[in-house]
Amino acid sequence: MLQNQSSHPSIPAFYINLNRDVSRRARMEEELANSTIQAERIPAIEGRAVPDWLQSFYDDRLGPGEVGCSASHLTICRIIIERNLPFALILEDDARIEKDCRRAIEIAVKLAPCGWDIIRLIETSSRPLQQVGVIDPGRSLVRYLRVPRSTTGLVVSQSGARKLLTPRLVKEPIDVEIRWPWQLDLDVYGIHPPPVTQASGIEVETTIPTRSRPKKRNQLRRMIFNIRKMGLASYLACFFGDREPTPQSEDFYARSHTIGAAGHSTRTVGRQNFGR
């Protein structure tokens, strides 16, 4: 239940919307109002109109839609750094937002271990999860064994923004770069069940390219990255576990000292019952 939420300062929030998509803008403004989130609209960048400061990031290997989506997200990352924001919510204009989304975000950023980069608010995967902390009964902060696709709803920290703005030639769509966190050393978490979903009945241009991928090589990189971030015991428990979030193991707790919501450490909240 939300109580007196409007009396609290708003979390930094932005949503991406093409100037010509007036109906999407109206729908999104209504979503935001219902969830008591105040978000600044950022005009989406067209793939063939990338700003000068991002020109060196792209060549012809990505389609216009992929370039535009990536450039729009990187533009907000730049705003996060310029305004010295500790983190910001980034939404695309096809997001459907649950009423308790804001509260879930406020707790999640307190639970997240020091140095977190991204907290996902949308989930499209059935991969096993590792529980990091309890947001409320039935909802947890988690780490993914395999990061889901979609950038419809993300919370990006300042460190995450800086990593996403690492000078490079962008070879993958933004959702793939986040799904392959080892490329930019992104520390990615998520809220499960997710407080953001994709609105039905809205046509969305996919950002997943159709070209082939070096699957086996990525599997090895993902495994090494996950073991480094999670610890071997936690990785194995998650890998052989089921869909329910697996509590953190001792090797992870020994490395984590973050204080979570209501003064509980990550170790304490990580061992609470997940709605069972």
Question: Where would I find each of the regions flagged by the language model?
Answer:
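An acidic/histidine-cluster motif and surrounding catalytic segment
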Residues: 1-91, 95-276
